[in-house]
Amino acid sequence: MIEFEKRLVAREALKLIGDVKLLGLGSGSTVAIFVEELAKSDKAGKIKVIPSSKQIEEVARNQGLEVIYPDGERPEITVDGADEIDSNLNLLKGGGGALLREKVLAYNSSTYVIIADHTKLVEKLCSKRALPVEVLPYGVSWTLGNLIKRFNCDARIRIKDLSPFITDNGNVIVDINCPPLEDPASMESEVKGVPGVVEVGIFVGLADLVLIARGSEVKVLRQGF
């Protein structure tokens, strides 16, 4: 059912593209499905895409889409996924480790659209998942210790294949196991205030539209409504 919902919401997002010429692409499994649907549509030969990760760049190239890199013109729309979405449309992101580039795309897009299945809806961010933080490799053990001390939470360097997970930017991901967030904006600011932190996977006020699939229906949520 979840796979069905992902494809359903991806197809719904495709309807929003219109005559857009430059499209930003987030990362993750739902965005990968969106790329597949985009490649099958009549828009495929008329659009250029800016990927947020090597993962989604590979998917886009394999699907025959024209890939470009950020330089000058900004995306009219970026389509992205999320790990959690709260009632104010704040987002938790970074499960795939692409949070920094995703946030750059989100900030520089005219419209930022989130697509997700219904399991991503939560009352408060960090209800189900740890908070991803991208940090510099330089002094990473110090940064980890400072995060643990500052927030009195368990925090660990993300491991992949027995080694620290390295982002596309050459950084490390630290996952903070914190309680559900009462004030995401404050938490974002506090985490970014720790030297060594590059970016944090809290996206406050960036999502313009959130498309949520539940069963055979897609609900559209808008910022401010």
Swiss-Prot record:
Record: active site: 102
Pfam families: Rib_5-P_isom_A
GO biological process, one term: pentose-phosphate shunt, non-oxidative branch
UniProt record similarity statement: Belongs to the ribose 5-phosphate isomerase family.
InterPro entries: NagB/RpiA_transferase-like, Ribose5P_isomerase_typA_subgr, Ribose5P_isomerase_type_A
Protein name: Ribose-5-phosphate isomerase A
Subunit (UniProt): Homodimer.
Keywords, alphabetical: Isomerase
Function: Catalyzes the reversible conversion of ribose-5-phosphate to ribulose 5-phosphate.
Enzyme Commission identifier(s): 5.3.1.6
GO molecular function: ribose-5-phosphate isomerase activity
Reaction(s) the record says it catalyses: aldehydo-D-ribose 5-phosphate = D-ribulose 5-phosphate
Gene3D superfamilies named among the record's database cross-references: 3.30.70.260, 3.40.50.1360
Residues holding substrate: 27-30, 80-83, 93-96, 120
Enzyme category, top tier: isomerase
Pathway(s) annotated for this protein in UniProt: Carbohydrate degradation; pentose phosphate pathway; D-ribose 5-phosphate from D-ribulose 5-phosphate (non-oxidative stage): step 1/1
